């Protein structure tokens, strides 16, 4: 079986965009190396697919440190925390993705771990119990979250840097597509590159996934280069519309325009009509529609905008 292609950037030069944050990280890394001490703990926040895990990996490469990955939603019990840090070596990096999903009942364990590199364990029960303190070797903790508002202040205060992953520009996404087309050994022309970028919601991961799916069609049709026509065909097959909307989002728009006659309508009515969970609509469907000004939230409910009406007429 062929080895899976690794397209994640390995260094800061490979990582497109986020120039201010990259500069700050390079300064921190250089300072830590000169002082021969671990890098301060870092918290990255931003939208999914924008490079938080990649930056953690690049930091690990820059420091020549071992990195251990974990998911916040899997850190549910005290033993999960203890297991995560039990084998930590000096200058290791512990990366926890979606750190906001850590069980809040065990979050306090992290405070002393991050601040003093110690963990207190209760041995025994009730009157016979005693606290045993374990000293950990100095390490760097990197957290990533898509929901910074769910990170408690005591936990946030343990990070030496809180870095926001800012929105990408179309030019950044186009460069990411070109860089990854080389890694994927596929040629792509300028118009095709621009079209993928415009349909990617300015999110690197989505752009790369669209490039991969277009490559699949290119191989299937035995073409030599990805062009505008092939990208357009791929997008239609995937059910992806202008600005990166999917079929569920377009159906939502059509319901506001046609079923509810362009009037403001309550979320409960929309939920009933689309047969979707309320949380799915709020977190998965509406954000892109709102950011593109295709719908607005009013005191009376959701309403399609004139831009949203024009969008439906255009697609």
From Swiss-Prot:
<feature type="region of interest" description="Large ATPase domain (RuvB-L)">
    <location>
        <begin position="1"/>
        <end position="168"/>
    </location>
</feature>
<dbReference type="InterPro" id="IPR036390">
    <property type="entry name" value="WH_DNA-bd_sf"/>
</dbReference>
<dbReference type="InterPro" id="IPR004605">
    <property type="entry name" value="DNA_helicase_Holl-junc_RuvB"/>
</dbReference>
<comment type="subunit">
    <text>Homohexamer. Forms an RuvA(8)-RuvB(12)-Holliday junction (HJ) complex. HJ DNA is sandwiched between 2 RuvA tetramers; dsDNA enters through RuvA and exits via RuvB. An RuvB hexamer assembles on each DNA strand where it exits the tetramer. Each RuvB hexamer is contacted by two RuvA subunits (via domain III) on 2 adjacent RuvB subunits; this complex drives branch migration. In the full resolvosome a probable DNA-RuvA(4)-RuvB(12)-RuvC(2) complex forms which resolves the HJ.</text>
</comment>
<dbReference type="InterPro" id="IPR003593">
    <property type="entry name" value="AAA+_ATPase"/>
</dbReference>
<keyword id="KW-0378">Hydrolase</keyword>
<dbReference type="InterPro" id="IPR008824">
    <property type="entry name" value="RuvB-like_N"/>
</dbReference>
<dbReference type="GO" id="GO:0000400">
    <property type="term" value="F:four-way junction DNA binding"/>
</dbReference>
<keyword id="KW-0067">ATP-binding</keyword>
<dbReference type="Pfam" id="PF17864">
    <property type="entry name" value="AAA_lid_4"/>
</dbReference>
<comment type="similarity">
    <text>Belongs to the RuvB family.</text>
</comment>
<dbReference type="GO" id="GO:0006281">
    <property type="term" value="P:DNA repair"/>
</dbReference>
<dbReference type="InterPro" id="IPR036388">
    <property type="entry name" value="WH-like_DNA-bd_sf"/>
</dbReference>
<feature type="binding site">
    <location>
        <position position="302"/>
    </location>
    <ligand>
        <name>DNA</name>
    </ligand>
</feature>
<dbReference type="GO" id="GO:0006310">
    <property type="term" value="P:DNA recombination"/>
</dbReference>
<dbReference type="Pfam" id="PF05496">
    <property type="entry name" value="RuvB_N"/>
</dbReference>
<dbReference type="InterPro" id="IPR041445">
    <property type="entry name" value="AAA_lid_4"/>
</dbReference>
<feature type="binding site">
    <location>
        <position position="53"/>
    </location>
    <ligand>
        <name>ATP</name>
    </ligand>
</feature>
<dbReference type="GO" id="GO:0005524">
    <property type="term" value="F:ATP binding"/>
</dbReference>
<dbReference type="GO" id="GO:0016887">
    <property type="term" value="F:ATP hydrolysis activity"/>
</dbReference>
<keyword id="KW-0238">DNA-binding</keyword>
<keyword id="KW-0963">Cytoplasm</keyword>
<feature type="binding site">
    <location>
        <position position="53"/>
    </location>
    <ligand>
        <name>Mg(2+)</name>
    </ligand>
</feature>
<feature type="region of interest" description="Head domain (RuvB-H)">
    <location>
        <begin position="242"/>
        <end position="315"/>
    </location>
</feature>
<feature type="binding site">
    <location>
        <position position="54"/>
    </location>
    <ligand>
        <name>ATP</name>
    </ligand>
</feature>
<feature type="binding site">
    <location>
        <begin position="115"/>
        <end position="117"/>
    </location>
    <ligand>
        <name>ATP</name>
    </ligand>
</feature>
<dbReference type="GO" id="GO:0009378">
    <property type="term" value="F:four-way junction helicase activity"/>
</dbReference>
<keyword id="KW-0227">DNA damage</keyword>
<feature type="binding site">
    <location>
        <position position="52"/>
    </location>
    <ligand>
        <name>ATP</name>
    </ligand>
</feature>
<feature type="binding site">
    <location>
        <position position="49"/>
    </location>
    <ligand>
        <name>ATP</name>
    </ligand>
</feature>
<feature type="region of interest" description="Small ATPAse domain (RuvB-S)">
    <location>
        <begin position="169"/>
        <end position="239"/>
    </location>
</feature>
<comment type="function">
    <text>The RuvA-RuvB-RuvC complex processes Holliday junction (HJ) DNA during genetic recombination and DNA repair, while the RuvA-RuvB complex plays an important role in the rescue of blocked DNA replication forks via replication fork reversal (RFR). RuvA specifically binds to HJ cruciform DNA, conferring on it an open structure. The RuvB hexamer acts as an ATP-dependent pump, pulling dsDNA into and through the RuvAB complex. RuvB forms 2 homohexamers on either side of HJ DNA bound by 1 or 2 RuvA tetramers; 4 subunits per hexamer contact DNA at a time.</text>
</comment>
<dbReference type="InterPro" id="IPR027417">
    <property type="entry name" value="P-loop_NTPase"/>
</dbReference>
<feature type="binding site">
    <location>
        <position position="168"/>
    </location>
    <ligand>
        <name>ATP</name>
    </ligand>
</feature>
<feature type="binding site">
    <location>
        <position position="205"/>
    </location>
    <ligand>
        <name>ATP</name>
    </ligand>
</feature>
<keyword id="KW-0233">DNA recombination</keyword>
<feature type="binding site">
    <location>
        <position position="8"/>
    </location>
    <ligand>
        <name>ATP</name>
    </ligand>
</feature>
<protein>
    <recommendedName>
        <fullName>Holliday junction branch migration complex subunit RuvB</fullName>
        <ecNumber>3.6.4.-</ecNumber>
    </recommendedName>
</protein>
<feature type="binding site">
    <location>
        <position position="158"/>
    </location>
    <ligand>
        <name>ATP</name>
    </ligand>
</feature>
<feature type="binding site">
    <location>
        <position position="7"/>
    </location>
    <ligand>
        <name>ATP</name>
    </ligand>
</feature>
<keyword id="KW-0234">DNA repair</keyword>
<dbReference type="GO" id="GO:0005737">
    <property type="term" value="C:cytoplasm"/>
</dbReference>
């Amino acid at each position: 079986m062929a080895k899976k292609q690794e397209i994640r950037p390995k260094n800061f030069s490979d990582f497109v965009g986020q120039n201010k944050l990259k500069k700050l990280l390079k300064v921190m890394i250089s300072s830590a190396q000169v002082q021969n001490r671990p890098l301060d703990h870092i918290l990255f926040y931003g939208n999914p697919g924008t490079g938080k895990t990649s930056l953690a990996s690049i930091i690990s490469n820059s420091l020549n440190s071992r990195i251990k990955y974990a998911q916040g939603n899997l850190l549910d019990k005290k033993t999960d925390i203890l297991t995560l840090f039990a084998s930590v070596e000096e200058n290791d990096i512990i990366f926890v993705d979606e750190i906001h999903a850590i069980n809040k009942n065990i979050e306090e364990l992290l405070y002393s771990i991050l601040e003093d590199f110690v963990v207190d364990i209760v041995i025994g029960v009730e009157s016979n119990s005693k606290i045993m303190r374990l000293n950990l070797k100095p390490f760097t903790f990197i957290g990533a979250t898509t929901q910074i508002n769910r990170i408690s202040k005591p936990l946030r205060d343990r990070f030496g840097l809180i870095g926001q992953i800012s929105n990408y520009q179309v030019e950044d996404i186009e460069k990411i597509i070109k860089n990854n087309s080389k890694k994927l050994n596929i040629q792509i022309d300028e118009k095709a590159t621009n079209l993928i970028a415009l349909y990617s919601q300015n999110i690197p991961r989505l752009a790369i996934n669209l490039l991969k799916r277009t490559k699949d069609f290119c191989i299937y049709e035995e073409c030599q280069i990805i062009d505008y026509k092939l990208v357009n065909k791929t997008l239609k097959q995937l059910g992806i519309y202008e600005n990166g909307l999917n079929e569920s989002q377009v159906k939502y728009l059509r319901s506001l325009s046609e079923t509810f006659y362009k009037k403001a309508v309550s979320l409960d009515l929309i939920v009933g009509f689309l047969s979707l969970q309320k949380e799915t609509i709020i977190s998965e469907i509406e954000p892109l529609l709102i950011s593109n000004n295709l719908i607005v939230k009013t005191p009376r409910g959701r309403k399609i905008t004139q831009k949203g009406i024009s969008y439906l007429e255009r697609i």
